[in-house]
């Protein structure tokens, strides 16, 4: 009996994997729209899907990013300049995309644009330090989605929201994790709303990757700039040794981040082209083996493991 149960489980696993590998047909007549294509995941995704034969519409924040991308891709790829925090800019872009795709609609929307913002202890920050990541990562994503949604519904297509392991575990103060937690919530509600329309909504949760967004040198510079303007009381509580060690720790992350950005693009590819896409994708070994498993553990264990990495404060009782 146990033998046949084992055989059944192996067969089910084989059939499940086979099902996941089935692909859609006729990608050469399908349009996809990707935000945040100047650099990083979005740039690689635009170039990859252009080579595969999709009609790619790549949204770039800068003219230089747009020009560089067009120089590396085929005539099928079009770029638009887009600031996702500008509602009028988003509306104009959506109208332009509508004119491009016509009755075919938009097969894929990849919400990739995002920023890290300031990463520092919460008691160092002001409300304004939280605002920019939330405006870009959350409200920008929602704005683009709502404006493009009629086109995706017409094609019965796919929406792919790039979140982060920072949407599962908050490991630093600032607006990044709150914005990504909110993206996860929006993603879940949108997925359920769009089910009846035949639109599949997926979420990608990358681990730590080497991109412009997560450049440890820039992150350290921002943290040091905030430190210099803190009140004497806060500086006394944390101590000079804290800022020195925490900056070293930040810069040290460069040695263990994922460098292969294609791991994220492969998730996008599966979500776009599989007949049976997943609802969630973890990208990077750290996400799969540490961050995601840790997110399912009790808070007391999460705190124990994450606080072990924290730099000690000089005098936290000096309040």
UniProtKB/Swiss-Prot annotation:
Intracellular or extracellular location(s): Microsome membrane; Endoplasmic reticulum membrane
One term under GO cellular component: endoplasmic reticulum membrane
Enzyme class at the top of the EC tree: oxidoreductase
Residues given in the record as substrate binding sites: 164
Signal peptide interval: 1-17
EC number: 1.1.1.209, 1.1.1.53, 1.1.1.105
SS bond partners: none
Annotated SUPFAM superfamilies: NAD(P)-binding Rossmann-fold domains
Pfam family, any one: adh_short
Active site feature: 176
GO molecular function (one): testosterone dehydrogenase (NAD+) activity
Keywords: Endoplasmic reticulum, Lipid metabolism, Membrane, Microsome, NAD, NADP, Oxidoreductase, Signal, Steroid metabolism
Binding sites annotated in the UniProt record for NAD(+): 34-58, 83, 180
InterPro entries membership: NAD(P)-bd_dom_sf, SDR_fam
Catalysed reactions listed for this entry: 3beta-hydroxy-5alpha-pregnane-20-one + NAD(+) = 5alpha-pregnane-3,20-dione + NADH + H(+); 17beta-hydroxy-5alpha-androstan-3-one + NAD(+) = 5alpha-androstan-3,17-dione + NADH + H(+); androsterone + NAD(+) = 5alpha-androstan-3,17-dione + NADH + H(+); 5alpha-androstane-3alpha,17beta-diol + NAD(+) = 17beta-hydroxy-5alpha-androstan-3-one + NADH + H(+)
Top-rank lineage group of the source organism: Eukaryota
GO biological-process terms attached to the record: 9-cis-retinoic acid biosynthetic process; androgen metabolic process; progesterone metabolic process; steroid metabolic process
Function description: 3-alpha-hydroxysteroid dehydrogenase that converts 3-alpha-tetrahydroprogesterone (allopregnanolone) to dihydroxyprogesterone and 3-alpha-androstanediol to dihydroxyprogesterone. Also plays a role in the biosynthesis of retinoic acid from retinaldehyde. Can utilize both NADH and NADPH.
PANTHER family: DEHYDROGENASE_REDUCTASE SDR FAMILY MEMBER 9 (PTHR43313:SF15), SHORT-CHAIN DEHYDROGENASE/REDUCTASE FAMILY 9C (PTHR43313)
Protein family (similarity comment): Belongs to the short-chain dehydrogenases/reductases (SDR) family.
Oligomer and partners: Homotetramer.
Protein name in the entry: Dehydrogenase/reductase SDR family member 9
The gene coding this protein: DHRS9
């Amino acid at each position: 009996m146990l033998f046949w149960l084992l055989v059944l489980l192996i067969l089910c696993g084989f059939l499940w994997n086979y099902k996941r590998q089935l692909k859609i047909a006729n990608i050469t007549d399908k349009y996809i729209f990707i935000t945040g294509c100047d650099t990083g995941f979005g740039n690689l995704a635009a170039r990859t899907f252009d080579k595969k034969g999709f009609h790619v519409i790549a949204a770039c924040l800068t003219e230089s990013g747009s020009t560089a991308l067009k120089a590396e891709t085929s005539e099928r790829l079009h770029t638009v300049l887009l600031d996702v925090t500008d509602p009028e800019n988003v509306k104009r872009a959506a109208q332009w995309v509508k004119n491009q795709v016509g009755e075919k609609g938009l097969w894929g929307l990849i919400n990739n644009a995002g920023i890290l913002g300031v990463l520092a202890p919460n008691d160092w920050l002001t409300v304004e330090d939280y605002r920019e990541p939330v405006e870009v990562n959350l409200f920008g994503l929602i704005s683009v989605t709502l404006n493009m949604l009629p086109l995706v519904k017409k094609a019965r297509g796919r929406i792919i929201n790039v979140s982060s392991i920072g949407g599962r575990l908050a490991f630093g103060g600032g607006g990044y994790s709150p914005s990504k937690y909110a993206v996860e919530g929006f993603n879940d509600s949108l997925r359920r709303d769009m089910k009846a329309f035949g639109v599949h909504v997926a979420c990608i949760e990358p681990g730590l990757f080497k991109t412009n967004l997560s450049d440890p040198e820039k992150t350290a510079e921002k943290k040091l700039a905030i430190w210099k303007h803190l009140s004497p009381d806060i500086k006394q509580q944390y101590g000079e040794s804290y800022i020195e060690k925490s900056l070293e720790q930040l810069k040290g992350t460069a040695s263990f981040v994922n460098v292969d950005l294609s791991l994220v693009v492969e998730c996008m590819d599966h979500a776009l082209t599989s007949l049976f896409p997943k609802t969630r994708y973890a990208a990077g070994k750290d996400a799969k083996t540490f961050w995601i498993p840790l997110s399912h553990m009790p808070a007391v264990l999460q705190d124990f493991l994450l606080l072990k990495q924290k730099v000690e404060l000089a005098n936290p009782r000096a309040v």
